[in-house]
Amino acid sequence: MAVRIKLKPGREKSLERRHPWVFSNGIHNVKGKPEAGETVDVVAHDGHWLGRGAWSPESQIQVRIWTFDREEEIDREFFKRRILRAQAGRDDLIREQGLTGYRLIAAESDGLPGITIDKYANVLVCQLLSMGADVWRDTIVDVLAELYPDCAIYERSDVDSRKKEGLASTMGLLHGTLPEMPVIIEENGIKIAVDVTKGHKTGFYLDQRDNRAMAARFVKGKSVLNCFCYTGTFGLYAANAGAASIENVDVSALALDTARLNMRVNGLNDDNVHYNEADVFKLLRQYRDEGKTFDVIVLDPPKFADNKSQLNGACRGYKDINMIALQLLNPGGVLLTFSCSGLMPADLFQKIVADAALDAKREIQFIERLSQASDHPIGSAFPEGFYLKGLVARVW
């Protein structure tokens, strides 16, 4: 008989709406002695069954629900079904955009809490961020090896959030032979170099794919400042779309080297591209003081808030950097600005940019609201899956 986790009165409502998390402060008692990662049944205070998930005793989220179907067992076939369903849901997108790099599993939003899997050509990269995901590692790898026999499988669970689960960071080859880095993926006819062993996250920001294409609409014959550029792919799309000049700015020399490589593998001349290894915050202030201006600016900063206590500081940071960027834009110019923090509500982010425009003494019009690419779905019961917010603003 499975271990049973009984909830406190009234704490069943979120699970009845199929939210997959059970917090420690919502648990009344535990019947049995579950091991970390063990499959447990969750019941309401009156005893009725709610879901089946993985036990994580050291986390504030003590159960992550695998299934809301009482008849569904958590075994190898369960993971195979989930992965096949996720792949089927992405097949149309892959054909439409010519993708060889995409997110295969988006954790809770694909019914596999704590599991992220990205496919980069013939390499699958896994992040296993929960105790349940970690315990099922060998099974997940076995299923992936069956379904994708030509792919190497590499783990990038080198993230601090595993500490909250009582897990150490880890990375390395799980199956097959890793090809020479970087691998080359394609999206929308653009080739992109990705190093899954050294790159950010799992190697690259697949979630910005649609927004890169959106940015290309505004750049023909324009001057473009691409801030926090990482491997320069907003600039790459801009070069392909005929931008007059591009400045890619990042603090990482390695990232900028990859940005140069991206231009070469696409056969693009980068005589009009400047690669600037610099602190974006300092550089924007310097350019403002020098009176330098641009037609298009992309702001894609790292996450400013990892927890709620950091949100106020993040708001100030977003306002400051957007204000300076707005001051650098020519009349009629375009700002594409992003927040990748799941804690930042979309409406609040828009208000911050609007307030930044007031401080910059610029009039702006919001012409697009942006989000993550559709291979990063948002489960209807899991609003936390909506993390990437973006705005396109015309500036006068």
Swiss-Prot record:
Domain PUA: 2-79
Reaction catalysed by this enzyme: cytidine(1962) in 23S rRNA + S-adenosyl-L-methionine = 5-methylcytidine(1962) in 23S rRNA + S-adenosyl-L-homocysteine + H(+)
Annotated Gene Ontology cellular component terms: cytoplasm
Top enzyme category: transferase
Main location: cytoplasm
PROSITE patterns: PUA
Compartment(s): Cytoplasm
Keywords: Cytoplasm, Methyltransferase, RNA-binding, rRNA processing, S-adenosyl-L-methionine, Transferase
Cited InterPro entries: PUA, PUA-like_sf, PUA_sf, RLMI, RlmI-like_PUA, SAM-dep_methyl-trfase, SAM-dependent_MTases_sf
E.C. no: 2.1.1.191
Highest taxon of the lineage: Bacteria
GO terms, molecular function: RNA binding; rRNA (cytosine) methyltransferase activity
Protein family membership: Belongs to the methyltransferase superfamily. RlmI family.
Function description: Specifically methylates the cytosine at position 1962 (m5C1962) of 23S rRNA.
Listed name of the protein: Ribosomal RNA large subunit methyltransferase I
Native source species: Shewanella sp. (strain ANA-3)
